[in-house]
Every structure is written in structure tokens, then in C-alpha cells.
């Protein structure tokens, strides 16, 4: 259940989530209809078989999960059937259907195929830190994160969440760290980075599995390249890649964090899930607060 990526948003800490368990059932995920392409709604963080519990709260952390069902209609299949239909009409009527007629034919085919299409299920998890006013979505896609914000908005009626905004240019901070400026306490460089020329269409250099402080890196910095992605390690607990878009990718929980689970005395699957949720939430909070200071992240009003 550990998150692998983090797309972060901020929201005012004054928001009231006390009625969340009452507000979620009306926007629970419903099965995608025969003539629908997709369906979205909340599901239980504990899995689709759990129908009663649609959220999970532990102290100031709230766990929400948006589920999805999408019909799979391969474009190649639709286009192949469309061409056959067009050929039949051309042979029968001696003319080839125009653009509008082809669009109608395609829409008819899709409606015909939808009830028989396979359904792909998905889930996107999010943790809300109610004390510090941020939400961490388990995705590297901004669009996926925005979709989760939209679902929460639909449940609450209003949810003024905004993407992270840094008061200093993230590229400048990341470039400074790799150039030798002191990192925040507990943070150290990993073995991966991406550097770009600041000009449009400029060169891109990707480094992996190598020391990030050395002559090779220095030459790229001297040539004016800026760091757009940087691998970092937080103590022995987390490793991740921070982008200049403020998205955290390749998040991994290390032994320093996982060892805490081994000392848990709770038994049972739900107790283990609770322990993992508590650990993950606390580590993400620690990382967020560190980045909030280092990058001067704006607060939501």
C-alpha cells in the first residue's frame, strides 16, 4: 500500500471534514452503465469488497480512495469496423460517406460495442494531512491528481485545493544542491539527476547510478544546464526523485522506516494496514515539512 509517487496540493486547514463519512456514500463509485464509457466515485481504502467504510482516519490523517471503471474499446477495432461499414455503403449506394456521416456511423458503432466492452478497474489513493493542510495523491500525473480534487469537491460541495507553489524557483534550489550548496538536515544526494539547457529545445542530460558531485556534473553546470530532476535520500527512511514541477517520483520506503513495522505488536490484516498507513503518513509529513521550508512553499488561504 505504500505510495510510489506524490502529486501534492494545499488546502486551508480551516476546512471541516467532520461529516465526511456522511458525505461520501452519495458519491460512491457506481458500476459503469451499459452505454457509459467510464464511472468515477469513492471506494473503501480497504478494497472494493468493503462497502460500509469509504474513508479511514488516524489522528490528523485522512485516507480517501477514488475508484474508476473504464470501458476498453481499442481504437483499431472501432476504426476497422467503421471502414467495413463505409465500404458496404459505398458498394451499395455508389458513394463514400462524408465526414458527418462517418462520425454518425462511428458513434453508432461505439454505442453498439459499449455493452460488450471489457471494463478496467482502477484506484487512486490520497492522504490528507488535516493539521498541515496538504493532500498527497499517489500518482505522478497532475491530471490524475486534479481528478481526485474534483471528486473531493463533489463530495464536500467546495474544496479550494491548489497545486504546490514555490516562492523560489525549484530549478535554482535543485541546481544549487548539486553544485555544492548545503542540503537541509537529513537530506542527501542520490545517484540520479536530469539537467536541461534553459533555452527552448536545449540539450537534456540524464545521469543514473553515478556520483552527482564530480567533474562530469560540474562541466554541465558550467555550461549553464539546470537541474530539473534530482534523486534525494531522507535519512535512511525515504529515497525519491524530486522534479522542478514539485512532483515526487520513485518514492521508496527504506529500512530505516520499514524496521519500525517489524517492532509492531499488533496482529491481523487490518492492524497491519493501520500500522503501514500510520508509518507512511508520518514519513510523508516529515518530507513535506522539510520541502516546505527548503522550497518556501506557499500556504493555501
From Swiss-Prot:
Keyword check for Cytoplasm: yes
Compartments where located: Cytoplasm, Nucleoid
GO BP terms: DNA recombination; regulation of DNA recombination
InterPro entries from the UniProt entry: RdgC (IPR007476)
MF-aspect GO terms: double-stranded DNA binding
Pfam families the record matches: RdgC
Signal peptide: none
GO CC annotation: bacterial nucleoid; cytoplasm
Keyword annotations: Cytoplasm, DNA recombination
Purpose of the protein: May be involved in recombination.
Record-stated family: Belongs to the RdgC family.
PANTHER family named among the record's database cross-references: RECOMBINATION-ASSOCIATED PROTEIN RDGC
Protein name as annotated: Recombination-associated protein RdgC
Gene from which this protein is expressed: rdgC
Amino acid at each position: 500500500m505504500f505510495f510510489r509517487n506524490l502529486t501534492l496540493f494545499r488546502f486551508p486547514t480551516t476546512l471541516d471534514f467532520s461529516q465526511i463519512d456522511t458525505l461520501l456514500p452519495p458519491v460512491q463509485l457506481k458500476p459503469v452503465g451499459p452505454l457509459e464509457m467510464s464511472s468515477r466515485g469513492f471506494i473503501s481504502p480497504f478494497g472494493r469488497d468493503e462497502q460500509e467504510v469509504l474513508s479511514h482516519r488516524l489522528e490528523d490523517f485522512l485516507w480517501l480512495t477514488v475508484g474508476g471503471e473504464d470501458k476498453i474499446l481499442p481504437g483499431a477495432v472501432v476504426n476497422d469496423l467503421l471502414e467495413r461499414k463505409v465500404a458496404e455503403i459505398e458498394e451499395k449506394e455508389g458513394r463514400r460517406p462524408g465526414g458527418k456521416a462517418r462520425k454518425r456511423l462511428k458513434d453508432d458503432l461505439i454505442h453498439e460495442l459499449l455493452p460488450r466492452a471489457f471494463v478496467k478497474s482502477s484506484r487512486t489513493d490520497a492522504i490528507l494531512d488535516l493539521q498541515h493542510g496538504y493532500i498527497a495523491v499517489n500518482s505522478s500525473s497532475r491530471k490524475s491528481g486534479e481528478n481526485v480534487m474534483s471528486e473531493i469537491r463533489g463530495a464536500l460541495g467546495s474544496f479550494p485545493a491548489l497545486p504546490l507553489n514555490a516562492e523560489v524557483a525549484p530549478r535554482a534550489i535543485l541546481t544549487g544542491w548539486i553544485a555544492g550548496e548545503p542540503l537541509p538536515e537529513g537530506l542527501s544526494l542520490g545517484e540520479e539527476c536530469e539537467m536541461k539547457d534553459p533555452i527552448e529545445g536545449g540539450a537534456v542530460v540524464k545521469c543514473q547510478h553515478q556520483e552527482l558531485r564530480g567533474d562530469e556534473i560540474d562541466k554541465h553546470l558550467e555550461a549553464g544546464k539546470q537541474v530539473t530532476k534530482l534523486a534525494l535520500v531522507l535519512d535512511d527512511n525515504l529515497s525519491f526523485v524530486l522534479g522542478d514541477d514539485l512532483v515526487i517520483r520513485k518514492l521508496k520506503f527504506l529500512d530505516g522506516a520499514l524496521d519500525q513495522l517489524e517492532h509492531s505488536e499488533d496482529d491481523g490484516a487490518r492492524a497491519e494496514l493501520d500500522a503501514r498507513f500510520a508509518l507512511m503518513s508520518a514519513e510523508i509529513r516529515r518530507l513535506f515539512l522539510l520541502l516546505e521550508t527548503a522550497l518556501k512553499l506557499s500556504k493555501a488561504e
